[in-house]
Amino acid sequence: YFAVCLTKLSHTKVELTYNLMRTFVAGLAFAMPFSLVYQMMSDRMKGLQKSEKVIKGLPFAAGFTAGTAVSIAGNMHYVIYAQIIPLIEKLTGKEVSSYWLPDATRYIGYNPCREEDRTIHEFPCYSFVLGDLHAHVINVFLVLTVLGILYSWMKTNSGKSWRQKEIGLLGLLMGMFLFSNTWDFMIYYVVICGTLLLGNLKRYSSDPFISQALKWSVIQWVELLAAAFLASLPFHLTFENVMVQGIGIVKIHTAFYQFCVLWAFPLLVCVPFVIGILKSIGTFPEKKFWSFFYSIKYPDLYGLVLVLCAIGLIFMPEFVYVRDIYEKTAPRANTMFKLTDQAYIMFGIMMAYILVFFTVNRIKRCNGADSTVMCKGLLRCPRLQSLTGIIAILVLISTCGYLENAITHWFTGFPKRNAYQTLNATNYLETAISDDAAAIRWLNDNVEGQPIILEASGDSYQDYDNRVSAMTGLPTVLGWYVHEWLWRNDLEEENQRKEDVQTIYTSSNADQIKSLIEKYKISYLFIGSCEAEKYGEINSELLTSLGKVVCRQGETMIIEVSDGERAD
């Protein structure tokens, strides 16, 4: 939806903006974490004594690391299974294991195989290489916008809630999440509520600060919900949710070693940061709670929210899951997928903030500068702490090798500049199924409105299934089988449609075909390579007698059916 809006605003062809949108989202996935962490680090350095200040380029280094961690880096699965294990196998004379780009996102339940608990744990870099423009990918730059606005609110939190533009803007974005990717609404409503609460606790860090902070937090939480539901009201008036069937309790849990492969590294970086902040409460006179909020810097307080939320997101699929059509073989898949994808973004931001400041700070201490301690709980010796920080940064950088590996495997070799082809996302059809491509061009050039076109029903991840509806935007009788099942949760209707589509293409009963054409208000029949492959002998002679052939290209033709009712 967002991509099409930008397409129309820019007067650009949709076949071009598909690839432009991929690069647009990927670019913002670097630029926005860079901007956020750059500002957080700049604010963290304010007010330090001259002897405490670290190098001027620290905000840039932290921002660059954040952009890299969110948009380019992979996870530790790549480092272990694509680098360390193959190296050991090579040195010991064993056959070297291969590594395929989805391996890093299909680990729990796949290696080793557990048919009853297959899971998904994707991250932005994988989606960018894959060419994915699903809602969770498009929403990457929007959730990063939310995180940026939240930090801006926390820094400038003054005045009553209804005077704060950030609350209204956040409500609008949350309303967009309700109809674009509801998972992000649930995740970021918690993130926002946590930030508002801690921000208000800092703002009212004097007696009786808790009652004031809670009062304004509750008001803002309600305002946020009201704004979100108001913004999404047109959607909810017509939307019927049949995808979710409730909440389930997890019966099969992730093996400890697999959990460590995926999440031990970010936890080892971020948990000491949390411990260091919480331990600092005990350093204040009489251990007064309000003194902690009065003294803590905004970047650290905001970072605390992000780390705690990220930790919650990776542990939640170990306890509960949202029930959907995958429940029998992959009950946790969708829940883990959507939650950990956002955890990865938050961890990426915070690992950059923590590691860069911690490492440079400890190096300065080794050189004799008496700097403030950002995280006291890791190691006591500054030299060992410096070495630990450097090693952690190198480990983070090593995960970036996943990008090169993924690109090389997905595109059968790393793309070279002189091998550039085109931005046109439909160009591959011209060489693969040129007759179909010509017929699709005819539809785009000659058909207006939204008449229904019949094509072969689709199956998941096939090369050219549903290529007509996808490349023209025209509705068809049945799209991808599993996706239609997930969205509508009505297998009886779906199976009936699948059978009816096959009947239209293969039946020799003209009255039966006419009845189905009228039932689905079909205006055009598309007969091409996929239909011939899927249904074998198509009764082309009978179908052409039902209407007029308006386009013929080689073995492909489009029939405008005379008995069909237009759905313009």
Each language-model region and where it sits:
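Membrane-interface alpha helices of multi-pass inner-membrane proteins
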Residues: 127-130, 168-181
